[in-house]
Every structure is written in structure tokens, then in C-alpha cells.
Amino acid sequence: MRKTIILFIFLHVLSYAFPIYFKHIGMKEGLSQLSVMSIYQDELGRMWFGTEEGLSVFDGVHVTTHKPTLKNETNKETTVGNSIDFITGDNQGNIYFNSDNSLVQYNLHTQQFNSLKQSGVTAVAFGNDRLWV
């Protein structure tokens, strides 16, 4: 009987749990496209979305879309492909993603894109303090 009362009280308390917070983010809020291929949350709590129209980041209030550009040998900016299939990070201020089979790094501190590998990248992940390509 005592176990039944404790179970009843426990279930009653659980029924008053707080509702789950959910915010829909779409094109109206600034997302570049509705088809999201990958999602990553960085160490600052921002959400990164890889779409076929670029890299979008949600800071809790606004969505900003990046069309990644790299500087070549002559310091001229060239656009990286827009389709972002995989995103990951190392919790040290770097976001890694693949775009058109190349590996790109985005530094959160300098806000610059760096090309790490030009071709042959189909997926990217971070684990055991290593970047897996």
C-alpha cells in the first residue's frame, strides 16, 4: 500500500512538468531554405543549419545566412558551393562543414572561412578529439 501511495504521488508530480519549449524557424524568420540537411549547436548555444542555399545560424533571436567565400592566392574572394550537407564543431571555436565535396572550416573568433580539403569529402564528424572526414 505504501509503495502505491508513493508511486501515485510521484506520477502526480511528474504530470506537472514544464512543457517543452519549441520555436519554429522557417524562411519567414530568415532561414535560407526549408530543406535543412544538418544541424549543429556550437559552444555559445547558437544553432547552425546546413541547407542547399548556404549556412544559416540562429542566435536565439535572429537568423543569419552565410554564403561561404574563401580568399585565393591573389587575395580574391571565391564562393564555396552553397549546398551544406554536414556540420560539426570542435568546441574550441571552429565549425567544420562540407560543401560541394570540399571541407571548410569557419573560425568563430575571426569569422573567416578556410578551405581544408578541396575534394573527396562526403561527410564530416568530430569525436574523440579528432575530426573525421
Residue ranges and their predicted role:
Residues M1-V133:
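Carboxylate-rich, polar loop motifs that coordinate divalent cations or form catalytic acidic clusters
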